[in-house]
Amino acid sequence: MSGRVTPVRILGSLAASFVAWLVLRPLVGEGVAAILALGLGALALRYVPRAVLLRMLWTVPLFGLLLFVTVQLMFHVPGSPFASEKNTTEEVRKQQEELYGIPQKGFVGGCKFFGRYVHHLVADGTMGPCIKVQGRSVTDVLLPALPISFSLGLMALLLATGAGLTLGVRAGLRPNTLTDYGSMGFAILGVSLPSFVIGAMLMVVFALGKPWSWFPVAGWGSFGHIVLPAVALAMPYAAYIARLARSGTIEVMNQDFVRTARAKGLPEREVVMKHALRGAIVPVVSFLGPAAAGIVAGSFVVETLFGIPGIGRWFVNGAVNRDYYVVLGTVILECALVTAFNLIVDLAMPLLDPRLRGKA
């Protein structure tokens, strides 16, 4: 057991269960969501460290604050979901807004909409109707897009971690050499260019270019469709991970225990795998949480650029068309994915760094 049962542990596990139930209920149904949420809460109460549960306790108010700010931003931006419809009188537009529960613009209207939305989300387990797709709910349109965005984000994160660790460790083992300069040059280039610029360049070279038309321009359905957008999302974070891994490797290789291991005659490969790689992984793993959030934000533009029918594309379409329910639905799902990944990182850090186990 991770620790004795305290009010913080109980409240933290309840918060984890509530957030899981809130997100899963529109996707898998009330019964399955309740079972999964209760199981998650029981596991959290028994095994999750107190510090992580304390963060989970703050998840509920932060989750609500994020939704509130999103609603207020939408209600202070000019435009209406029905403003683009031609040959529609003002009276008909007002009736449509009343039908979809959309009050007047402004702070008060945003507060009313936020209250109704949270009430329906908690009481009914629905994310609302999709305004621009008649007869379909937000859950209906986002559920098929969720595995697409998840697989794209996971592939990008794996590429960023693998490439960044490889370049960073090699540079850290050979500082001030051609390998080091080449790796850091890649890092500077990757950090300087945003994902959508990298994506456009990759599309021109490897999809539209006649000599190297290896990958499809846009769409989804085969492994080739995921390569270019995943590389575009991964490259900026691979560059940053390479810098972290290089610094961690240099720091570890100058420690006394590494010199002792070498003095005992351990092979260089074993020294690198047991000590250098572990020293490089610790700062990288701590960065994976912010990297996941950045990849989620970058996927909004990259999915639109490559025509991928994921959650990010629905978010952009919802923002352009003022489809408030779709925007809030995508915010909820993306926030839940980032929160879950940050939880995994928090649980993995004490396993990699023994110094953190006493603080858990």
Residue ranges and their predicted role:
Residues 1-58, 176-177, 347-360:
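Transmembrane alpha-helical segments of polytopic membrane transport and secretion proteins
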Residues 5, 103-165:
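An internal, D/E-rich "acidic patch" concept
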Residues 15-36, 40-43, 62, 155, ...:
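Generic hydrophobic transmembrane alpha-helix motif, especially the helices
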Residues 21-25, 41, 45-49, 70, ...:
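Membrane-water interface at transmembrane helix exits
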Residues 38-51, 71, 75, 131, ...:
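Transmembrane-helix boundary motif in ABC transporter permease subunits
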Residues 50, 142, 146-179, 195, ...:
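Alpha-helical transmembrane segments of integral membrane proteins
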Residues 62-115, 209-225:
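Hydrophobic alpha-helical transmembrane segments of membrane transport/permease proteins
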Residues 77, 190-193, 296:
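Transmembrane helix irregularities
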